[in-house]
């Protein structure tokens, strides 16, 4: 065997160096929110396509720091409440600023305006600054959990609540 068989030639070395940043970019992100693919990414809890940037939410947590996407803050609240690691301080909870539809806010620091026409009908829109018509995260979370899943998120045959309200929609 010749002594050159174990050496990398110049062309192979350059190709390897060029591929390294590309391969590094393929590594999954483990913190912070990620861009949504509007009109393509599905909501984890209801399966509907996320299309309204003013109400989207993301949760990152668990042992693998997996990112999960939602079309409404209410779906994210319900989903997280069912996770065994829900109280882990490392869990990240992001919500889109409803005023801009382009800026992610830390959901626990955001303020929520009630009465919004949100995709799953939980009725909360996140905003950056407090106002006389907003509530904090804990208040919004409590109201969403007490209300339960909206009828839009329940499997067929499990619709509950006022049938007149459903007929109007």
Model-derived regions, located:
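N-terminal secretory signal peptides
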Residues: 1-22
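Residues immediately within or flanking Cys/His clusters that coordinate Zn2+
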Residues: 40
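Short cysteine-rich clusters marking metal-coordination/redox-active sites
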Residues: 43
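Cys/His-coordinated zinc-binding microdomains
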Residues: 47
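Short, non-ligating residues that shape and space the ligands of small metal-coordination modules
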Residues: 52-53
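Mature extracytoplasmic domains of secretory-pathway proteins
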Residues: 68-113
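Beta-strand-rich cores of mature extracytoplasmic or soluble domains
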Residues: 97-169
């Amino acid at each position: 065997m010749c002594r050159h068989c174990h050496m990398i030639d110049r062309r192979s070395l350059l190709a390897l160096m060029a591929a390294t940043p590309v391969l590094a970019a393929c590594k999954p992100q483990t913190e912070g929110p990620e861009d949504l693919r509007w009109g393509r990414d599905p909501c984890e809890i209801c399966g509907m396509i996320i299309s309204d940037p003013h109400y989207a939410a993301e949760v990152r947590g668990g042992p693998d720091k997996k990112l999960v996407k939602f079309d409404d803050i209410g779906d994210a609240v319900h989903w997280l409440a069912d996770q065994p690691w829900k109280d882990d301080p490392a869990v990240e909870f992001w919500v889109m600023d409803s005023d801009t539809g382009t800026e992610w806010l830390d959901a626990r620091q955001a303020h929520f305006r009630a009465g919004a026409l949100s995709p799953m009908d939980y009725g909360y829109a996140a905003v950056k600054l407090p106002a006389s018509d907003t509530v904090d995260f804990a208040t919004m979370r409590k109201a969403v959990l007490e209300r339960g899943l909206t009828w839009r998120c329940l499997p067929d045959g499990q619709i509950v609540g006022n049938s007149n309200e459903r007929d109007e929609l």
